[in-house]
């Protein structure tokens, strides 16, 4: 964290937010484990004191919506002393109940859709936006992350998808809901 903060200061930032990926009910290479949470929060607190007066710092977590049992609205995430929470959908359940990571490069996304969803891109897109909408209904976060992730991968899978009326309607309806709720969408 220290290196990121020093770089932000050197580039003239006046404020900077740090957000790790929140723990999941299973281990991944890219998410924090619960037993590291206290270290994450205390290291941030130390750095906030160290850089006080030089840069305004905020700490957050990017929290995955998987289902009703794992999402940003859960008390275990709400009780954490965070400045902000990002709600995201990185994974979907396949029809067989297997968790499939869809936050992948486009070529791997194609393989995963073909293998786990029988190549039915439309159902994957609908499931993704259904999960995003459910996450928004449940709340518990300040920022929507990766709102365009499906947009990119699905259009690589099927060029021209972005021009299809049903897709445009789905995306517009989704953004209308997050705007009505006062959320900000961040893509990175």
Where are these regions (language model features)?
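An N-terminally biased module of ancient metal coordination in phosphate/nucleic-acid-related enzymes
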Residues: 1-67, 77, 151-169, 173-174, ...
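Short, well-structured alpha-helical segments in soluble
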Residues: 75-76, 136
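Glycine-rich anion/phosphate-binding loops
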Residues: 1-2, 68-72, 122-128
């Amino acid at each position: 964290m220290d290196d990121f903060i020093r770089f932000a200061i050197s580039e003239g930032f006046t404020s900077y937010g740090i957000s790790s990926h929140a723990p999941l009910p299973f281990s991944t290479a890219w998410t924090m484990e619960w037993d590291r949470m206290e270290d994450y929060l205390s290291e941030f607190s130390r750095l906030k004191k160290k850089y006080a007066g030089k840069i305004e710092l905020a700490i957050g977590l990017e929290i995955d919506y998987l289902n009703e049992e794992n999402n940003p609205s859960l008390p275990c995430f709400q009780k954490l002393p965070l400045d902000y929470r990002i709600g995201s959908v990185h994974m979907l359940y396949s029809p067989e109940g297997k968790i499939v990571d869809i936050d992948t490069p486009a070529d791997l996304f194609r393989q995963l859709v073909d293998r786990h969803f029988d190549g039915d891109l439309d159902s994957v897109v609908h499931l993704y936006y259904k999960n995003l909408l459910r996450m928004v209904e449940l709340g518990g976060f300040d920022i929507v992350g990766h709102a365009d992730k499906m947009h990119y991968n699905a259009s690589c899978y099927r060029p021209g998808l972005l021009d299809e009326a049903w897709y445009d309607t789905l995306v517009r309806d989704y953004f209308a809901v997050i705007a009505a709720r006062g959320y900000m969408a961040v893509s990175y």
